[in-house]
Amino acid sequence: MADTPSVAVQAPPGYGKTELFHLPLIALASKGDVKYVSFLFVPYTVLLANCMIRLGRRGCLNVAPVRNFIEEGYDGVTDLYVGIYDDLASTNFTDRIAAWENIVECTFRTNNVKLGYLIVDEFHNFETEVYRQSQFGGITNLDFDAFEKAIFLSGTAPEAVADAALQRIGLTGLAKKSMDINELKRSEDLSRGLSSYPTRMFNLIKEKSEVPLGHVHKIWKKVESQPEEALKLLLALFEIEPESKAIVVASTTNEVEELACSWRKYFRVVWIHGKLGAAEKVSRTKEFVTDGSMQVLIGTKLVTEGIDIKQLMMVIMLDNRLNIIELIQGVGRLRDGGLCYLLSRKNSWAARNRKGELPPIKEGCITEQVREFYGLESKKGKKGQHVGCCVC
């Protein structure tokens, strides 16, 4: 991976994908002769807040919002700028990168301040978030060759999704065969820079061959009232584990606010949805992650992707439009095990997908649907195949 200019990594939620770039960035920051400046982009503002908290711990890296870089230029101190996809696609960011060498030389009177890594987390969204694809168009104008290395990470990007996602942003796509790095260096067609290289895929899920999320107990339950059942589950959780946290995924922004209003008498609640401003989303996410007294986070499906909370013990999903990627991302927040409930009203599971989108998950065995998504071999009849999800 070290010698490959562009890499994509698919690893199960909870694997520790952050450390795949965090440790190399710390090593780059420790170099005395050259200052490397890297950039990390995540899909949503909610995830941005979580990343800023995690990566800024222990003081090993100087971390700042990419908005600072876009508005003011490089400050001479920051090791890692963190932003969202909208920042990555912005003309102002593209222009800053294009003018990097001239700006650095004029401002700092040196050429020893260089662009390091471009890191994109949960990059499957470039292909699967159909309604946002027009927003990603500006990424194709970025000079990828200005960076020393590009790293694309996801817990839900099988080869077909990964290849399409990379091509969406103007890259070559995945390498079609295993290529030795010396072969890449010898190729006359790949001499222009990073964007000319096919991206090498590291599929850690297939290498492990185990169906992800087996550590989480997943229960599909038909109920008369989703909110009432969710309330019962939460009350039971906090009676047994009062220091724990829970996430509830609602189907609409209105439902988010209604649940937050009615549950405040029982729990300390934080709610987030897309109609809030960016600064408010960041503030509320930080409050839920860092304040041990906050118990329940309520939001639409985007609230779960990539967020990492140690005390989280339960995820409840009330949205019957979730596709398999959204399900995996939601369940994957339970890093050390826990309970995931999918609550559906009796005789009401009839969600439809929009054109171009992945279809909603089906009623039935969740493990089997996860296995099919990742292209793993079926082990029907073998002990352990359905641990934590069903008894079929």
Curated annotation (Swiss-Prot):
<dbReference type="GO" id="GO:0003676">
    <property type="term" value="F:nucleic acid binding"/>
</dbReference>
<feature type="domain" description="Helicase C-terminal">
    <location>
        <begin position="232"/>
        <end position="381"/>
    </location>
</feature>
<dbReference type="InterPro" id="IPR011545">
    <property type="entry name" value="DEAD/DEAH_box_helicase_dom"/>
</dbReference>
<keyword id="KW-0347">Helicase</keyword>
<comment type="function">
    <text>Catalyzes DNA unwinding and is involved in telomerase-independent telomere maintenance.</text>
</comment>
<dbReference type="Pfam" id="PF00271">
    <property type="entry name" value="Helicase_C"/>
</dbReference>
<dbReference type="GO" id="GO:0005524">
    <property type="term" value="F:ATP binding"/>
</dbReference>
<dbReference type="GO" id="GO:0004386">
    <property type="term" value="F:helicase activity"/>
</dbReference>
<dbReference type="InterPro" id="IPR001650">
    <property type="entry name" value="Helicase_C-like"/>
</dbReference>
<comment type="similarity">
    <text>Belongs to the helicase family. Yeast subtelomeric Y' repeat subfamily.</text>
</comment>
<keyword id="KW-0413">Isomerase</keyword>
<feature type="binding site">
    <location>
        <begin position="11"/>
        <end position="18"/>
    </location>
    <ligand>
        <name>ATP</name>
    </ligand>
</feature>
<dbReference type="GO" id="GO:0016887">
    <property type="term" value="F:ATP hydrolysis activity"/>
</dbReference>
<dbReference type="InterPro" id="IPR027417">
    <property type="entry name" value="P-loop_NTPase"/>
</dbReference>
<keyword id="KW-0378">Hydrolase</keyword>
<keyword id="KW-0547">Nucleotide-binding</keyword>
<feature type="domain" description="Helicase ATP-binding">
    <location>
        <begin position="1"/>
        <end position="175"/>
    </location>
</feature>
<keyword id="KW-0067">ATP-binding</keyword>
<dbReference type="GO" id="GO:0005634">
    <property type="term" value="C:nucleus"/>
</dbReference>
<dbReference type="Pfam" id="PF00270">
    <property type="entry name" value="DEAD"/>
</dbReference>
<protein>
    <recommendedName>
        <fullName>Y' element ATP-dependent helicase YFL066C</fullName>
        <ecNumber>5.6.2.-</ecNumber>
    </recommendedName>
</protein>
<dbReference type="InterPro" id="IPR051363">
    <property type="entry name" value="RLR_Helicase"/>
</dbReference>
